[in-house]
Amino acid sequence: MRIQLPIIRTNSDSHPGGRSALTCRFRCGDACFHEVPNTTTNPYVGDVIADAVSRRTTLRAAAVVTAAAAVGGAATVAAPQADAAVAAGAATTERTGTFSRGARGLRFNPVAPNKNDVVTVADGYGQNIVIRWGEPILNGAPAFDPDNQTAKAQAGQFGYNCDYMAVLDMPHERHQQVLVINHEYTDEVLMFAGYDAANPTREQAEIAWAAHGLSVLVAAEDRRSGKLTAITRHRLNRRVTATTPFEVTGPAAGSELLRTSADPAGKRVLGTLNNCGGGITPWGTVLSGEENFNQYFGNAEKVTDPTTAARLKRYGISGGASERKWERFDKRFDVAQEPNETNRFGWVVEIDPFDPESTPRKLTALGRFKHEAAEPRLTDDGRPVLYMGDDERFDYFYKFVSSKRMMKGTSRAAREHNRTLLDEGTLYVAKFIGDSPAAEIDGSGKLPEDGEFDGRGEWIPLASGNKSYVEGMTAEEVYVFTRLAADKVGATKMDRPEDVEPSPRTGRVYIALTNNKDRGAAGKAPADEANPRNANKHGQILELAEGWNDPAADHFSWRLFLVCGDPEDPSTYFGGFPKDQVSPISCPDNITFDAYGNLWISTDGNALGSNDGLFGVATAGSRRGEVKQFLTVPLGAETCGPIVQDRRVLVAVQHPGELDGASVEKPASAWPDGPGKLVRPSVVAVWRKDGCDIGV
């Protein structure tokens, strides 16, 4: 195979943000260019404005800063902190255990926007590649050979398009860590020379099945630097693919809605697809959300039952042949033959990284939609609470509150008990209510008179166990068709809620709302206080504080922390920080926290003409809102799955070189191995050369 030198391209098409048409084609099946699945007339934030002034006064007198336990991007779990009730925006103290306790701003020199075809890091930092697509991680797996790929080889090699990453401490091994990394999607044009989209081969399809899923691998730390190196063929290393058996658990397990000809019991599913954001549970398992699963299924237009067709359409499943044509090689991807197979995707999956023989699970109590995140917290009495976004234009934000308490320890009894915690509880959807008069929210992004986009909200219950709270729907229907249930109860339409992260210091929950080109368009939802800009190209980050400092509360307060874009754009807002002192940022996607309470944001589809990157921002103190760019990824790439530890940052560099017109033979990037080599998604570690903590 002859690979030419990379040809630098720009994207001049009309795709949203800065994404290429190639990315949209393979990642989400051109979701933004299909009809919006949510066609309801649900109320929007800002519609309820009666008594706005008095409500604002009441809220500000009683607002709280949450201080419950939280789980971040690393394996450790913060201890429960003391409750603190403070006025919104008021200074907090070390005594309260909230924002200012140990909080620091970020002290590196920001990286300038660029179009470099490398990972560009802040001055004083080093980097190395931890693992590339195709590198062997299992015993017997061969070295990667781009000209001789096979499904068998790929099943033992690191998967394609790395996204979410979890890092857990290796028991009894101080300088080793367990990495769990999921693989969102495949781009066959950049994987296979001479790929014919109209006539893919069975081998290409089976390689793609093996390149999806998750990888579990152990990595070793260099004690003299922050370098991290994958340990190939470690006993804990594992691949989970699109053909790995999964157990279905929770209240919808065995439902008629999940039964197929291959699985008449409705309790065993082959594989997981389009994994995106996730989370680490306090008991040491890893969660991963199935997102744009709809694109893998073909022939929905042949479904004649109107109820089934309407349900499929609400999940974006329509039309004829799928992009990858998998229905030609396995009938489960043919909706006309197996209409229930689609219902077996769109779940949060759970995997035990310390037991390579365990069966991964699909958790039906958490609802079915395009899951982007599954971030846990603990209540004071030890019940896990999960926050989840549905990454679609005008879809919703959810949480799940378990009815069972976590058992501490790592005994067999504790592990068996804790693996049931996410099967029993209550599923909720959020309704956001603004506190400003409607006339002050005009779609321009101009701040209302009170100086903030803020308000209150409530959690609307959908189902608990076998009980449905949604009129006209059974509990099983609520879990399997969660979008339809949320439609019925009047949940708030959001601008693509993606990653969610509770602060380990305060418990406040941060939600990345990536963008929404259709906000305010004719016949579409208008701007509201939580989504204040029409044709929202750049996105925003919302900050949510649960009532009474309790993650299980039925109400909350909220405010927009960042309204992203070019600082010179009058519609942007950076937590009140001077806009001439921040880095431009567009399309926030994955988020995480460091130990000092700083929020780190990776971007997807930068609409400002620069490469995507990783940004840090203080969430408290005098530097709250000071956004600083820490790194950029190569041409065409997205920054995914950031993990910020004291001495190391990990980022997944997804779809490098995925620019319009690119192919294996005519690449748009030479990363990571230089000209003449195949472009390969990879994981990168970054560290401070002086050995000090990252960012501060």
Predicted stretch roles:
Residues 1-53:
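N-terminal secretory signal peptides
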Residues 212-219, 344-353, 401, 537-547, ...:
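Beta-propeller blade signature
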Residues 116-132, 140-153, 224-266, 351-368, ...:
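Blade-edge beta-strand/turn elements of extracellular beta-propeller
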Residues 646-696:
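Blade-level signature of beta-propeller repeat domains, shared across WD40, Kelch, NHL, RCC1
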Residues 51, 57-83:
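N-terminal export signals
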Residues 580-620:
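Loop/turn-rich, solvent-exposed surfaces of beta-rich toroidal or solenoidal domains
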Residues 153-167, 264-277, 488-499, 577-592, ...:
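Signature of short aromatic-glycine-proline-rich micro-motifs recurring in repeat-based ectodomains
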Residues 184-208, 294-339, 402-405, 515-536, ...:
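Short, conserved, GDST-rich strand-edge loop motifs in beta-rich repeat architectures
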